[in-house]
Amino acid sequence: MFDLRTKVMIGIASTLLIAAIMLITLVFCLYQKISKALKLAKEPECCIDPCKDPNEKIIRAKPIIAETCRNLPCCDDCSIYKDVGSLPPCYCVTNEGL
């Protein structure tokens, strides 16, 4: 019915069509997986699992109260490198430089 040249062209065209459909499907599946992973990453960590008891209370972490900061040593007392000229201004008092 068809000559050899036409059969070869139909075979090449069908192979390219199948390859294009497979690549489109692969890209679509990867897009779905990435969008699902990004959507799950945006959800808050303290949400309630639907499999657990809905009346369960969420216990939040208590804030850590910062202790009073001690004074930092002056930069002249703790210079590390001999070849370095002047170091940045030292902060002997925690409020200095703020």
Curated annotation (Swiss-Prot):
Record bears the keyword Secreted: yes
Domain of life: Eukaryota
InterPro entries to which the protein is assigned, alphabetical: FAM24
Subcellular localization(s) per the UniProt record: Secreted
Signal peptide: 1-29
A GO cellular component annotation in the UniProt record: extracellular region
Main subcellular localisation: secreted
Any single Pfam family the record assigns to this protein: FAM24
Keywords, alphabetical: Secreted, Signal
Stated family: Belongs to the FAM24 family.
Protein name: Protein FAM24A
